[in-house]
């Protein structure tokens, strides 16, 4: 019983072996171009099963399994079952030749002898209308040393941006091509901005340039008030009423024996600086000369409470009045505010003096110190210069300071605005009944 099973298995194995061999033979006959010979015969591979030997024939491949030697011959396939040896396939050649690197069947994209396509991409040294990759002049982008009409990447000259050392009509990025775009890197001639060490960039050069920052600016408004019930400016000198001078008007002495304006009796030296029609002409403010500043109070001399309101008589105008004002010194203790209104935020005080330094009354020589409330009046700036009332603005110099403005340098621009004079009842927006002159002071400081 056991012998029958073994015999059945051997028969089945033999049938399977022959079926597989026949199938392999059919497949090898279908692909004759890749047929290789095994052994020394002109047939195919021999297969041996067991100790049997395959005879030489003119058939197809022989297969050897085991230690048997299946020889290739011109006969039919020999198959042996046993301890035969199968020979290793040798290096024989079939009828079909494989393509090698020496012969190119068509256009090869590489380093061979094939020509580059005219409309495609060129990776060799040829010239194409597409992108040129390599050293050839392509009409597209040149990558490497080629000259492409598109962007040039590398050392080529492309009409697009040149990346590297190429000369591209676009932006030159890298080691210096002549690109019409921005030159980024080691210098080309780019028409855009040159970033880095670019040589001839017609755009802006971003590098080690230095730009000057703006000055430190400070703006405040100074309110100079003449007369009224609460003046901030007081005249301390006037012209000399000396008949020996024969009408000549030298610089002043303290307010007292002044030439009367209304043909009245000159006031004596004991008037204690009272404001009346004998010394009103000497009260010229920062706004310049004003003829219509005197109220006609029944020709009375003491008009302190009513001065100055533009509702009465007029002082003499012309050169005589201007000459009377020449040399008048006025001390000030003006308020500094944030805005042009007198009631706006208080910044500090301006203390000093100004002198009517022009015979026509159009300029004031000023020297004052602006002290600021924010630091407990410890921070201050000193100014000196000439304020001209006949021009739109004047420049005076900064003469140092204290606190955080110590050793300050710079200048200030002064603009004068003559405020409306009047009583508090008639003009409630005014906080004074005197003649107010507003000076806008814009300070430019450097340290």
Swiss-Prot record:
GO (cellular component) term, any one: Casparian strip
Effects seen without this gene: Increased root suberin accumulation characterized by an increased aliphatic monomer content in suberin. Reduced day time transpiration rates and increased water-use efficiency during the vegetative growth period. Decreases in the accumulation of Ca, Mn, and Zn and increases in the accumulation of Na, S, K, As, Se, and Mo in the shoot.
InterPro entries xrefs: Allene_oxi_cyc_Dirigent (IPR044859), Dirigent (IPR004265)
Annotated Gene3D superfamilies: Allene oxide cyclase-like
Top-level taxon of origin: Eukaryota
Chief localisation class: secreted
Signal peptide: 1-21
Compartment list: Secreted, Extracellular space, Apoplast
Keywords, comma-separated and alphabetical: Apoplast, Secreted, Signal
Tissue: In roots, mostly detected in root endodermis and quiescent center, and, to a lower extent, in root stele and cortex. Expressed in root vascular cylinder, flowers, siliques, cotyledon and leaf veins, and leaf margins. Present in the basal region of rosette leaf trichomes and in developing xylem.
Pfam family, one: Dirigent
One GO-annotated biological process of the protein: lignin biosynthetic process
Biased composition (Gly residues): 74-85
Record field: compositional bias (Low complexity): 86-107
Keyword Membrane: no
Disordered: annotated segments: 74-123
Primary role: Dirigent proteins impart stereoselectivity on the phenoxy radical-coupling reaction, yielding optically active lignans from two molecules of coniferyl alcohol in the biosynthesis of lignans, flavonolignans, and alkaloids and thus plays a central role in plant secondary metabolism. Regulates suberin accumulation in roots.
UniProt similarity note: Belongs to the plant dirigent protein family.
Subunit structure of this chain's protein: Homodimer.
Alphabetized PANTHER family for the sequence: DIRIGENT PROTEIN 10, DIRIGENT PROTEIN 24-RELATED
Protein's name according to its UniProt entry: Dirigent protein 10
Organism encoding this protein: Arabidopsis thaliana (Mouse-ear cress)
Name of the gene encoding the protein in the UniProt record: DIR10
